[in-house]
Amino acid sequence: MIKSIILQAIMVLSTLTSVHGANSSGCGKQPTLVNGVHKINDREYILKVPDNYNANKPHHLIFGLHWRGGNMNSVVNGESVEPWYGLETRAQGSAILVAPNGRNAGWANINGEDVALIDAIIKQVEDDLCIDQSSRFATGFSWGGGMSYALACARAKEFRAVSVLSGGVISGCEGGHDPIAYLGIHGISDPVLPFDGGVTLANKFAANNGCQQTYVGKPGLGSHSSVQTDFKGCSRPVSFIAYDGGHDAAPLGVGNPLAPDATWKFFMAA
């Protein structure tokens, strides 16, 4: 079973194009994939294609990864967050979005099986739809943040950027030596995945990206505010936003634009 997962991952990865690549083979095709649930191997995901989809226009590809105890519907419907982490509305038809389902309501990524799932979804989607292969992104909260971090480690050459919301090293970090644009967003009073751990994740990619060592600022306790730190001298951008709060899927409250705005802006500038 383990050998099969690894072999499948190697075969799929060999077909993926790096962030320096061109447009996907789905460009110019009449698509067969439609909005809704799709199955791949023994897993599933929800796909959202823009209403004004143009098969000749390359789109961003954005993965929204759910938290522990959630599922793909939690991301799509916006349970405790804006739907699609607020990125669908900000994309204004420029992105195709994917919400995969984790195993057992999480992303343990045993033997890399969840990274292999993402690889397989990318291939299936890009074979059918028009994607700018230099414009793949991932974001998620808590365990979804941990899975986004795992993708930054294992697939830095395939993804342009990740946004890790209150994440930790809970889905592994195979590889983890290559540069990738990295945004971390973390509550200073997080009781589940501590704030200092979130800073450590960002510092790892600051080192990979050749950034200067930087002090990460924090807002005052009870200020209901945030402080953004942008690392300097980086080959790929690294930023970290500390906010006054705990382990929150929607930093500073549901409907607050902090995380969606920062994530979208970071992705588009990466």
Swiss-Prot record:
E.C. no: 3.1.1.73
Record's keyword annotation contains DNA repair: no
Highest taxon, organism lineage: Eukaryota
Record: glycosylation sites: 23
Catalysed reaction, written as an equation: feruloyl-polysaccharide + H2O = ferulate + polysaccharide
Molecular function GO terms recorded: feruloyl esterase activity
Gene3D superfamilies with a match to the protein in the record: alpha/beta hydrolase (3.40.50.1820)
Annotated disulfide bonds: none
Subcellular location, record wording: Secreted
Record GO biological process: xylan catabolic process
UniProt keyword terms in alphabetical order: Carbohydrate metabolism, Glycoprotein, Hydrolase, Polysaccharide degradation, Secreted, Signal, Xylan degradation
Signal sequence range: 1-21
Similarity field: Belongs to the faeC family.
Protein name as it appears in the record: Probable feruloyl esterase C
Lineage, top ranks: Eukaryota, Fungi, Dikarya, Ascomycota, Pezizomycotina
Gene name as annotated: faeC
